[in-house]
Amino acid sequence: MASKYSNALYVTENGTSDPRDLNRASYILSHAYAMLKAIESGLTPRGYFHWSINDNYEWPQGFKQKFGLFEVDLITKERKPRPSTKVFKEITSRNAINGDLLKLVVFSEKPPGELI
């Protein structure tokens, strides 16, 4: 692939609808780990764009899908961080995957908000 398309890699609109935020932290971590493996294999990621910062409108389902790292109250418009934002912040602020974080998310039965 690299000879045909170059080594540049852009990951866009990468996220999961998870209304109760039970699996999003593991999802984020597993995709960050895949980016690390891509780097180790010689690809050069140019960007990773999580979908989405806030809950939003999805054409087929309206406001039922919950992709946001931040929950949006549709009445008051208040935005509250979901527990998985802690995992996203940990990875992005360090620009790395902390080994302890990996163990916690992969092997823990606790909700993601209780991990950090």
Model-derived regions: residue spans:
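Non-catalytic scaffold segments within catalytic domains of secreted glycoside hydrolases
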Residues: 1-116
